[in-house]
Amino acid sequence: MSRVGKLPIAIPEGVKIGLNDLEVKISGPKGELSKTFKGNIAISLAENKLLVKPLAANKNVRAMWGTARSIISNMVTGVKEGFKLKLEINGVGYRAMVKGKYLNLMLAKSHNTKIEIPSDIKIEMPKQNIIILEGTDKEKLGQFASIIIKQRPPEPYKGKGIKFENQFIPRKEGKKN
């Protein structure tokens, strides 16, 4: 039994759910999300709660059971409240700015890095070294954040690079004479 999978998903007010076999469409005040699931999973709606149940007892189906429930729960949270990620840029001369539909990163390379911003993600920049990402889809938000971080991951000696707001970077000692 999956401890995560057997929990029902409460549906808050203002969120509408559409079920079509293994396709789930969820719409709310922040937007609309849809996802098609594979595997032997049954998704049902009863008394303002979504239930996810496995149709087989093998290991792969049980693994997908909890995963599917978590994805649907994140979709409900996303269309109701949305998700927010905060990234910090550390380093002398490291900064970012939004130009149109591109995020322009200046990270001590010979060229500036331009990353296209997906249409369903909003970017706020209170300072040149802080990037706040907002969106309804937690998976796409995390993917976009990892693309940004991959441009200059934090290094352990001086701590320069792009990292999540509260991410701990283990520091190393430099060379000793």
Swiss-Prot record:
One of its GO terms (biological process) is cytoplasmic translation. Keywords: Ribonucleoprotein, Ribosomal protein, RNA-binding, rRNA-binding. It comes from Rickettsia peacockii (strain Rustic). Disulfide bonds: none annotated. InterPro entries: Ribosomal_uL6-like, Ribosomal_uL6-like_a/b-dom_sf, Ribosomal_uL6_a/b-dom, Ribosomal_uL6_bac-type, Ribosomal_uL6_CS. One of its GO terms (cellular component) is ribosome. One of its GO terms (molecular function) is structural constituent of ribosome. Part of the 50S ribosomal subunit. PROSITE patterns: RIBOSOMAL_L6_1. NCBIfam families: L6_bact (TIGR03654). This protein binds to the 23S rRNA, and is important in its secondary structure. It is located near the subunit interface in the base of the L7/L12 stalk, and near the tRNA binding site of the peptidyltransferase center. The lineage of its organism: Bacteria, Pseudomonadati, Pseudomonadota, Alphaproteobacteria, Rickettsiales. The keyword Ribonucleoprotein applies. It comes from the Bacteria. This is Large ribosomal subunit protein uL6. SUPFAM superfamilies: Ribosomal protein L6. Belongs to the universal ribosomal protein uL6 family.
